[in-house]
């Protein structure tokens, strides 16, 4: 147990010391566990009292340590490989973060205008320091892990086919010396054809956030490297630097040689790349130069040097020079196949506004912006355009009232109210109104106004009549034309001025000037004389609505409610002291209840008073009933109102009856007496062929008389009792009465009811002709039972 515990603690301590990412908390926890174990071993429980036991324990401890060392070496190799892979992964992440930080710094440097340029002596051309480039290439080679296809964060070149051995940086070899790590190096040419190199340097190794990384913890995990390898690597970098410097010395000669050819060349210039292209090193470049198309470049000493210089510049992330674009395009294999050009976003234009809110340019001039036309198709805009296009003229008076000499300004006439159009009120149109108006206009235009009215009346009558015959269409007589009231002539002197003027004429008054000599001063007073009111010639107003006729039950209910309301009002007035309260109704039955002790003092006197009061009350009741009782004249008037209509009504109804035979005296008496009792006018004309009865009167009387003629009198039974039946009458169907026509007229034609017995039809017709209603006889003659 002790050996296993010791080997476990020893292995934990060794792993903790070898691991680069152990935390202080974990170290402190393990240290506390180790102290606890040591205290436990030093306690009395683990202390051995024998010397032999302690020696055995030492032997076991040595054996355990030996085995743990062997196991630790095996496990250490695996741990080192694991840590190596983790560091390589962290290095790739760090390179990516550096590349992102480099891009951000480039953008910030381009935005702020802070460019770091390196100048060279001589012709004033700008050249980059190749020492920095060599150190940058050396750092790149040192950071790329063995066998990995990581991406170089500085130049953006993918190293797919190349493999590099992992070596430590120069900072680990010489810790006292601070090394400048090149984050980015971009070459451009200005308008003076000088090369400009923008570089951003960060001293030492830095993390993604710019803080320096400590290499103390990683030194134990890195493998030991030989100093000869470092020297070889440095020599290689210096050789590469010298070769690149020699090859780029020929760039000015190349520029001078390309000027005459580029000016006379028909080829167009290739626009320079604005950003660093991402070029793959695995891309194949053509090593052979085409024989054709290089006529102007015979003076170039070393074409291969130019090709290799451009290739190295592309690998290190340099921009292509825009003046060498025609030369570079002549090498078909030199352009990278996987070229991606990412344009930088242009800066948005600056909006400048003056104090009034108008847009101005950098010199302060107001920029005229064309106002966009209104393309909206809303109903509001359409109506506005129509209103602007069609100007509505306001109404104007035809003649100015102030120019009229007879216009009185004191009348207070407002011209605005006259010109203001009347607002149309909401009116319902009856069905068929417009059709009737159109027909009336058609008749008026075709027949004239008078003829159109006659046709309208006839059509209305024809609509109410039967299909066979329409008695209303029969012309009664010529219509009496209405007499129009003649207009009064305009007098020479108005009646209100005749009493005031001296001579009663306007002749002496000229130009409207009136003096006291023209007037009767005594007639003038301080009173205002108003003219007599004249009613306008308008139709009479329609009669007011008639009250609703109630049933007997409803009338009783209303009477009870009125009596209760009256009694309640009386009690309220008595309560307020406005009326004297009535005396108590004392009877013999309630004598003791009402009077109490007073009834026992003088019973005889009290009884006499009670009987006298009861007799008075009874007499008052009788008098009230007698006062309410109708007189004989009132009873007769009431009966007349019940039997007959109001005599003031103008309407008169006419009924024409046709009777087959009216020879029986009983039926003749009924016909005559009922007509007179019902106050009907008319006549009864009897002939051998038929009899005609015409009655005129009010609606109630005509209704009762119609029941008599059509229902109450049995015409067939009356003829049988007479005993003068013939076989012809039985064949014809017996005696009968028909209502030929019933209608209303404006004025009655008869003054009383007469009975006429005529021998011939001409005599009977003459009776109706004298009354002016010969058409009644024609109606009866032409009437058929069918």
Curated annotation (Swiss-Prot):
Disruption phenotype: Embryonic lethality when homozygous. It comes from the Eukaryota. The keyword Transcription does not apply. Residues 1-80, 87-112, 123-143, 190-203 have a biased composition (Basic and acidic residues). One of its GO terms (biological process) is embryo development ending in seed dormancy. Residues 534-547 have a biased composition (Pro residues). It is found in: Nucleus, Nucleoplasm. Its main location: nucleus. Keywords: mRNA processing, mRNA splicing, Nucleus. Residues 1-223, 255-283, 532-557, 616-642 are annotated as: Disordered. Residues 165-176, 268-283 have a biased composition (Low complexity). Residues 145-164, 177-189 have a biased composition (Polar residues). The gene is RDM16. Pfam families: PRP3, Prp3_C. This is Protein RDM16. Functions in the RNA-directed DNA methylation (RdDM) pathway. Acts as a pre-mRNA splicing factor, likely by affecting Pol V transcripts. Affects DNA methylation of transposable elements (TEs) and preferentially influences NRPD1- and ROS1-targeted loci.
